[in-house]
């Protein structure tokens, strides 16, 4: 079994202990996903050379701010591009309002463009942003995209351009109030 989306950097335990625990649970490989600049560095320093771990690099929409130097992030990703299996976690998240909507768009589009240039897949976080998400991602039909924690309807999936779009469902499918997600899970091709 492979864990395709882990945030081990958020757990205060030694790397070897975390990966040993995963292996004991039957997880043979972990994709360690970055969400901000510190987690990109942590991935490069703690996880990049671990045999049963792959890393990503990217800025999560809730990590976007004036304090984050996008050019510096992209330069760091480029410097270590061969170590990253994907770009992300990136995307759009309007759950807490859209005060930084323009900035989220800027960071997201820059990371999609970077992924296209370097032929890397993108791990996408999308919450309460379907219309804007479609406008942006459909400009990149040639970029492989994984919609992490898919939480919308099947119409969204059908509206995606190209055939390089994948979705992952999480434990939210066990919630009775998530009917549209359960319907999507039944309809999205596996």
Protein language model features and the residues they cover:
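Mid-domain alpha/beta scaffold segments of enzyme catalytic cores
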Residues: 1-190
């Amino acid at each position: 079994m492979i864990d395709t989306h882990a945030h081990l950097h958020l757990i205060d335990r030694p790397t070897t202990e975390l990966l040993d625990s995963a292996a004991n649970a039957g997880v043979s490989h972990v994709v360690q996903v970055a969400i901000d600049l510190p987690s990109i560095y942590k991935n490069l320093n703690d996880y990049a050379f671990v045999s049963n771990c792959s890393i990503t690099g990217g800025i999560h929409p809730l990590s976007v701010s004036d304090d984050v130097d996008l050019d510096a992030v992209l330069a760091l990703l480029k410097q270590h591009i061969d170590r990253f299996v994907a770009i992300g976690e990136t995307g759009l998240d309007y759950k807490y309002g859209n005060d930084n909507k323009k900035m989220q768009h800027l960071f997201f589009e820059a990371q999609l463009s970077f992924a296209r240039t370097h032929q890397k897949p993108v791990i996408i976080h999308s919450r309460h942003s379907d219309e804007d998400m479609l406008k942006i991602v459909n400009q990149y039909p040639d970029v492989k995209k994984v919609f992490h924690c898919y939480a919308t309807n099947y119409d969204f999936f059908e509206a995606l351009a190209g055939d390089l779009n994948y979705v992952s469902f999480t434990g939210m499918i066990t919630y009775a109030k998530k009917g549209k997600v359960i319907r999507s899970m039944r309809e999205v091709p596996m």
